[in-house]
């Protein structure tokens, strides 16, 4: 029943807004280590399989709703977690930064790593005003909620010194560079925290003025 409901919801969005919404399903894979069927390589596998789909490669991801032909034109992918939302205009600013000539990634084909430019950008991440006071934990660790108009002038040590920031799983990456550098790169059932690794190979940059 939930599959049918999902179909109807996505189709309704496409009818209302003229297309652009997709519904994907991942084929479960048996994990001998966990002794159960699950998404291959968890979230890291989800990104890998999405990129493989965009590149017309073998993947456990299938398109249930939406035209696959349009997917071949996808150049960038924006990654968000379930507890993350985009501010108005953030997506446009991230795409603009990725498309800037000075930021174009240069990939070492032999080492399969970005050597200059950036194939991934990490924007500033802040706690929403409402969420900052939702619990004692968020009040302690979340700091001040909302958008900070003055913090945009602050620097980041990693990016300032090495022209390379850290990636925490929320940002934008170039599909071509991701596929070249990361597809089949890591052993299975060995990595849970994959964000920093991906950011290192793709030479993540920090968008300090984008939140």
Name each model-derived stretch.
Residues 1-211:
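Internal catalytic domains of large membrane-associated glycosyltransferases
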């Amino acid at each position: 029943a939930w599959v049918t409901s999902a179909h109807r919801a996505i189709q309704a969005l496409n009818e209302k807004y003229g297309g652009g919404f997709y519904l994907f399903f991942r084929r479960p894979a048996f994990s001998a280590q966990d002794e159960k069927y699950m998404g291959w390589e968890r979230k890291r596998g989800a990104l890998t399989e999405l990129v493989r789909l965009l590149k017309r490669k073998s993947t456990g991801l299938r398109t249930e709703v939406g035209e696959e032909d349009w997917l071949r034109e996808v150049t960038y992918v924006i990654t968000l977690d379930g507890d993350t939302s985009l501010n108005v205009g953030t997506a446009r600013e991230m795409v603009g930064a990725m498309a800037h000539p000075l930021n174009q990634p240069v990939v070492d084909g032999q080492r399969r790593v970005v050597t200059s430019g950036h194939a991934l950008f990490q924007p500033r991440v802040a706690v929403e005003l409402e969420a900052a006071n939702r619990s004692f934990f968020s009040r302690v660790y979340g700091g001040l909620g909302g958008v900070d108009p003055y913090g945009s002038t602050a620097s980041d040590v990693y990016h300032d010194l090495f022209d390379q920031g850290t990636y925490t799983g929320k940002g934008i990456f170039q599909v071509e560079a991701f596929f070249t550098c990361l597809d089949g790169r890591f052993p299975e059932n060995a990595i849970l925290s994959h964000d920093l690794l991906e950011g290192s190979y793709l030479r993540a940059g920090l968008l300090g003025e984008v939140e």
